[in-house]
Amino acid sequence: MNRFARIFLLGSCFHCHFSHAQVSGSEPVALPVVGIHYGGAFSGGDLAARYGYFNRLGLTAGYKLKSNWSFGLESDFWFSDNVRLTGIFDHLVDDAGNITNDLGMPASVLVYPRGVHVNAYIGKLFTLSKNNQNSGILVQLSGGYLLHRLRIETNDNVVPQIELDYKKGYDRLSTGFNTQQFLGYSFLNNRGSVSFYAGLYFQQGFTYNRRTINFDQPDIPVSTARRLDLQTGFRVGWYIPFYSAEPREYYYN
């Protein structure tokens, strides 16, 4: 048996032992939960002046109490190709309309919005059915660290004006604190691995510009005012609830 097969078999056994255990849904249970999710978000506030729609991939890890309160950590990585900033590299364009590399040849310069946040959350589950009191309407509040910037790529080209630390003069790095609210539905399967959550979220980023100069606007002071970066979007995720296995009964003659 090759190494991959052994790892797959071990993971399958681990998953089956914990998440396939049959648990009655008539009563809430306490259990750890790990999940992965995808989401999309529309930018608002100051963020909308720089970027448009974001895709988001994330992880969550937490603990659900018998009271149906929950707490934990969640993190999202943001990625997009929707840039609303214009003219960033206009001063590097030659008379032929090209940005040239170190060999004097036309170069391709690409920019991509990127971001990340890491939050601590607290949530409350409001059950809708007596048959499964571990599923229902989920409300979460969270807060933590947020960062967003422009990723600048020149691929196989070397463009001296935007290499290494010079990129910092164009990347619009902003960091700060964020708050987030989530409203959706959470389904914990009592008898299997098909457990999911889905809903809407609203995020407010209270960030600051972290660069002291923008090379494309050297005569314009970088604002030191607090930014309000807003996002409104959806999230769909799958998670593994780590139910404890039911004790087995043994009979002896």
Where in the sequence are the language-model features?
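Residues on the lipid-exposed face of transmembrane beta-strands in outer-membrane beta-barrel proteins
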Residues: 36-40, 59-63, 75, 118-124, ...
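Sec-dependent signal peptide recognition
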Residues: 2-10
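Short glycine/proline- and aromatic-enriched beta-strand/turn motifs that initiate or cap beta-hairpins
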Residues: 21-72, 78, 237, 241, ...
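Residues that define the transmembrane beta-barrel architecture of outer-membrane proteins
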Residues: 30, 53-57, 114-118, 135, ...
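Predominantly the C-terminal beta-signal and adjacent terminal strand-loop region
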Residues: 181, 187-253
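Extracellular/periplasm-exposed beta-strand and loop segments of Gram-negative cell-envelope proteins
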Residues: 45-50, 83-115, 148-176, 207-216, ...
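Short loop/turn motifs that connect adjacent beta-strands in outer-membrane beta-barrel proteins
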Residues: 22-31, 68, 128-136, 188-196, ...
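Structural signature of outer-membrane beta-barrel domains
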Residues: 41-43, 78-82, 125-127, 144-150, ...
